[in-house]
Amino acid sequence: MAPDPVPTPGPASAQLRQTRYFTWEEVAQRSGREKERWLVIDRKVYNISDFSRRHPGGSRVISHYAGQDATDPFVAFHINKGLVRKYMNSLLIGELAPEQPSFEPTKNKALTDEFRELRATVERMGLMKANHLFFLVYLLHILLLDVAAWLTLWIFGTSLVPFILCAVLLSTVQAQAGWLQHDFGHLSVFGTSTWNHLLHHFVIGHLKGAPASWWNHMHFQHHAKPNCFRKDPDINMHPLFFALGKVLPVELGREKKKHMPYNHQHKYFFLIGPPALLPLYFQWYIFYFVVQRKKWVDLAWMLSFYARIFFTYMPLLGLKGFLGLFFIVRFLESNWFVWVTQMNHIPMHIDHDRNVDWVSTQLQATCNVHQSAFNNWFSGHLNFQIEHHLFPTMPRHNYHKVAPLVQSLCAKYGIKYESKPLLTAFADIVYSLKESGQLWLDAYLHQ
């Protein structure tokens, strides 16, 4: 540890309050591998060992930055940073020693400094403020589609054509509600967390039947460390079902591990990926999650969804028809959800956490899909995935405004800013799985 400065004569209380100084080496040792977890924000060192379990955003997301500088993710994720800092005072244990740099040598200082200037510019431009009318209209269009689905059966009967049309409309409702709950979950609609949380519960719980706490727990980790093995839950299918990226498959091959025939994963992806994720996994796991963690408020919101659809569709369809409709909707929604959410990340760099700077962390793991009215609607503006990852609390209707500024920053520092057509993005998922599988096979057979 860097030596503390020599105490100067003064009141005893002043000496007790004397600042402790630490080095990056000391901080890095408190990464949670043992008992202690420290992190750094604006050169101040915080001990989060006990607090991590009480962290409102989830215990894992904050622990993923243990032993590291967390200044940029702290700024990115919190909308009321002044209030949060007051609660952080009890965790403060010292500062970085004066001779220590402001962040680790693995991070690009010039890039980080310029991104922080860009962040300040974005805030001055008002791009972090939401247009509430946009989100109101978006919610209304979801509710209208929901009503239209029920009216289709009520007016035209339950024969095949109205039944299929109803299923398509309900699938659209579920997909679009998924994008809208994402907005509220990221605190990007209202200026206070309270209103965002309330509407998040309504949309994800009552309109979709899923728990807000589960989404927070999973999704914030993804944003904190995208495509980082054992830190991003979105790539937890590695290595049980898939070998992902270019680094991890080679590791598996060299270790002679074969949980699945990965060289065929680009084929079985169509069976266990898009069609199965929601109806065969998420649909059941979310109930285990809320009961195991005693999230009774979430459970109540979820049950309100099931009660609503049961009492509105059972009288029209009967039990068998209702269950058939429900699982067809989940099947269609699952395909929509998986293709859209994976197109931005699976073809990109996947590795262990290398503790690089915020911009590099997000750009190496993320790509965009070209803007169009359809692409924006179909993906819930997640075609602007780069901008969303750099500024997760930014309202989605402002992504296209900040995109040129991000492109300029990337060009200046030689960072690839990748954007592609929608169908190309879908195809790249399959191509990347095929390439990863071949890398695994080569390492498995020859290394």
Curated annotation (Swiss-Prot):
Topology within the bilayer: Multi-pass membrane protein
Conditions for induction: Expression in liver is down-regulated by dietary PUFA.
Tissue specificity as recorded in UniProt: Highly expressed in the adrenal gland, liver, brain, and testis, tissues where lipogenesis and steroidogenesis are active. Expressed in colonic mucosa.
Any matching Pfam family: FA_desaturase
SMART domains attached to this UniProt entry: Cyt-b5
Residue numbers carrying N-acetylmethionine: 1
Motif Histidine box-1 boundaries: 182-186
Residue span of motif Histidine box-2: 219-223
PROSITE patterns in alphabetical order: CYTOCHROME_B5_2 (PS50255)
One cellular component term from this protein's GO annotations in UniProt: endoplasmic reticulum membrane
GO BP term, pick one: fatty acid derivative biosynthetic process
Cytoplasmic side stretches: 1-124, 181-268, 330-447
Segments passing through the bilayer: 125-145, 161-180, 269-289, 309-329
GO molecular function, a single term: acyl-CoA (8-3)-desaturase activity
Alphabetized UniProt keyword annotations: Acetylation, Electron transport, Endoplasmic reticulum, Fatty acid biosynthesis, Fatty acid metabolism, Lipid biosynthesis, Lipid metabolism, Membrane, Mitochondrion, Oxidoreductase, Transmembrane, Transmembrane helix, Transport
Catalytic activity: (8Z,11Z,14Z)-eicosatrienoyl-CoA + 2 Fe(II)-[cytochrome b5] + O2 + 2 H(+) = (5Z,8Z,11Z,14Z)-eicosatetraenoyl-CoA + 2 Fe(III)-[cytochrome b5] + 2 H2O; (8Z,11Z,14Z,17Z)-eicosatetraenoyl-CoA + 2 Fe(II)-[cytochrome b5] + O2 + 2 H(+) = (5Z,8Z,11Z,14Z,17Z)-eicosapentaenoyl-CoA + 2 Fe(III)-[cytochrome b5] + 2 H2O; (11E)-octadecenoyl-CoA + 2 Fe(II)-[cytochrome b5] + O2 + 2 H(+) = (5Z,11E)-octadecadienoyl-CoA + 2 Fe(III)-[cytochrome b5] + 2 H2O
Keyword Nucleus: no
Cytochrome b5 heme-binding domain residues: 19-97
EC number: 1.14.19.44
Free-text comment on this protein's domains from its UniProt entry: The histidine box domains may contain the active site and/or be involved in metal ion binding.
Family in the record: Belongs to the fatty acid desaturase type 1 family.
Protein role: Acts as a front-end fatty acyl-coenzyme A (CoA) desaturase that introduces a cis double bond at carbon 5 located between a preexisting double bond and the carboxyl end of the fatty acyl chain. Involved in biosynthesis of highly unsaturated fatty acids (HUFA) from the essential polyunsaturated fatty acids (PUFA) linoleic acid (LA) (18:2n-6) and alpha-linolenic acid (ALA) (18:3n-3) precursors. Specifically, desaturates dihomo-gamma-linoleoate (DGLA) (20:3n-6) and eicosatetraenoate (ETA) (20:4n-3) to generate arachidonate (AA) (20:4n-6) and eicosapentaenoate (EPA) (20:5n-3), respectively.
Protein name: Acyl-CoA (8-3)-desaturase
Species for this entry: Mus musculus (Mouse)
Gene: Fads1
